[in-house]
């Protein structure tokens, strides 16, 4: 059996990410052998300029997608997708969720200092954020975290790949925020 062809067919047909274990079960190999085949396929797709597709890994799952270079051709045949606008407020809220997840709206609002209802709703609508469950606390508030779409959009395989701020950068941001607050209060 051509296992690589079977993996390609699975990923193409599913159209979304498929966990390693599910692929292994489908082709009746163990996960180690399946991962080796997937890694080989990823290298083959990336190294070939004659293939318009890539296979990407997203937090232990795999997905087939088009190479970014193919966008100009795809846009000619497909309707232009609705452009998402990530405002400063949305980016700030998304950053808090990405780094603090799982996080409640109350925790987000405590960090931001303002209501985040609209921002969180918009991020859920854009499929960058999802409900992860409820906190075991009074009122059982919803917990939010990032989605696979977030990982795809920001070009990372897992949350662990997000940049980590050094203590110096954190201090610089704090100073900038304090200066900004002073300017706003003086007006």
Swiss-Prot record:
Cell compartments where the protein resides: Cytoplasm
One example of a Gene Ontology biological process annotation: chromosome separation
UniProt-listed InterPro entries: ScpB_csome_segregation, WH-like_DNA-bd_sf, WH_DNA-bd_sf
One Pfam family in the UniProt entry: SMC_ScpB
Domain of life: Bacteria
Keyword line: Cell cycle, Cell division, Chromosome partition, Cytoplasm
Any one of the GO CC terms: cytoplasm
Major location (coarse): cytoplasm
General function of this protein: Participates in chromosomal partition during cell division. May act via the formation of a condensin-like complex containing Smc and ScpA that pull DNA away from mid-cell into both cell halves.
Known partners and oligomeric status: Homodimer. Homodimerization may be required to stabilize the binding of ScpA to the Smc head domains. Component of a cohesin-like complex composed of ScpA, ScpB and the Smc homodimer, in which ScpA and ScpB bind to the head domain of Smc. The presence of the three proteins is required for the association of the complex with DNA.
Family affiliation: Belongs to the ScpB family.
NCBIfam families xrefs: SMC-Scp complex subunit ScpB
PANTHER family: SEGREGATION AND CONDENSATION PROTEIN B
Name of the protein in question: Segregation and condensation protein B
Protein encoded by which gene: scpB
